[in-house]
Amino acid sequence: MKIVDLLAYQVLDSRGQPTVAVKLFLENDQSVVAMVPSGASTGTKEALELRDGDANYFFSKSVKLAIQNVNNIIRPHLLNKNVLNFFELDNLLINLDGTENKTKLGANALLGVSIVIVKGGAVAASKPLYQYIKEDLMHNYDEHYYAPIPLMNFINGGAHADNNLDIQEFMIVPLNAISFSQAIQTGSEIFHELAKILKANHLNTAKGDEGGFAPMLNDNYAALELLVRAIKKAHYFPSKKQGVCLALDVASSELYENEKYVFKKALSHNTNLEQTSFSSDEWAKYWSDLASQFPIISIEDCFDENDWNGFSLFLKNNPHIQSVGDDLYCTNLKYLQKGINFKATNAILIKPNQIGTISETLDVIKYAQENNINTIISHRSGETEDTFIADFAIGVGAGQIKTGSLSRSERIAKYNRILEIEQELKDKLVYEPNKFFKFN
């Protein structure tokens, strides 16, 4: 099926900042739309998110240049092309930019087009998006699919909230569930119990960027204790063994300065932490000790993006924890290969806008899976209502998904899309935590 037209335009993300939307028009008056997310805590290895820098528009945040690049440079090369030739078209995008970090056209321009080509291909193939991704892009024809285990961000801190918590995300992971819908039920009940506990203790129930609560607390322990209380109050068992466990995104690159790890918010708010500055070895011990006191099964970016030795030593000493690389890898095959050589982590966070195209994202996922590295499909803190990553997580067999809390519709939309897919696939969609958490 031929591409008839392509149009990029500016929309807003969940923070009210401009982002790129792309609409693809196919034969027979069919069309699809993609919207590009944006991060707050970004790794230095990420592909360039092109913004205008014009102070007269959206405080320099507008994306008119990226939109012009789609409409004036990319569009003419795609007209009348067969939308089903995904890899050929995606390679065309990469070559049109011609730079390693997408600095010519912008990763936000390229990704919008890349996603919309995938969506258009699914329409042309008359397949659900997740099935098209699995069969036509991953070349996997097994009739069974894996439902992603949700890592739900219930307490927000760091760059995602205006509170005194330095850890960016405090999450719950429902390993107890036997289906995705039961996992969502578990999460919803815990989320609402957490709200009751916060109110009862006169703590703020305002939400952060990703829909989690953003209270002012004494320290990181207090946040974890609140989650454990909420799990118990909702009549679940806080445990790494088929219970409801915890996960963290430390975003350590945001806390690293002068070769030290520093709890910056804790310092500025005079909280009760006994220690606020750590060497790499002390930092590793802090997280190991924390994981021994709470049912923590996964820690993301527990070291700076360039502290390869720190990651490697932590994984060696904590093989029972899922150690996730986000800023460490930035969904870039070159850095993942280095990480595997270093034995740096046993999991990678996948954010398509960090690399800029879906084909390059698929290369990273395939390489990770071939090397027994867990893959977690992730949203960004500046999200849209686009549910692409829900289908993507199922289509590539990622096994896990991070898409925020159980509030804010741009987060809920992804969960609801997976629930919809569950209804379509029924028992062909398998929720199997033990497959993806073998080390717990």
From Swiss-Prot:
Its EC number is 4.2.1.11. Its cofactor is Mg(2+). InterPro entries: Enolase, Enolase-like_C_sf, Enolase-like_N, Enolase_C, Enolase_CS, Enolase_N. It holds the Pfam family Enolase_N. The active site is at 210 (proton donor), 351 (proton acceptor). GO terms for biological process: glycolytic process. It catalyses: (2R)-2-phosphoglycerate = phosphoenolpyruvate + H2O. (2R)-2-phosphoglycerate binds at residues 168, 351, 380-381, 402. Pathway: Carbohydrate degradation; glycolysis; pyruvate from D-glyceraldehyde 3-phosphate: step 4/5. One of its GO terms (molecular function) is phosphopyruvate hydratase activity. Binds a second Mg(2+) ion via substrate during catalysis. Gene3D superfamilies: Enolase-like C-terminal domain (3.20.20.120), Enolase-like, N-terminal domain (3.30.390.10). Its main location: cytoplasm. NCBIfam families: eno. Catalyzes the reversible conversion of 2-phosphoglycerate (2-PG) into phosphoenolpyruvate (PEP). It is essential for the degradation of carbohydrates via glycolysis. PANTHER family: ENOLASE. This is Enolase. It comes from Ureaplasma urealyticum serovar 10 (strain ATCC 33699 / Western). The gene is eno.
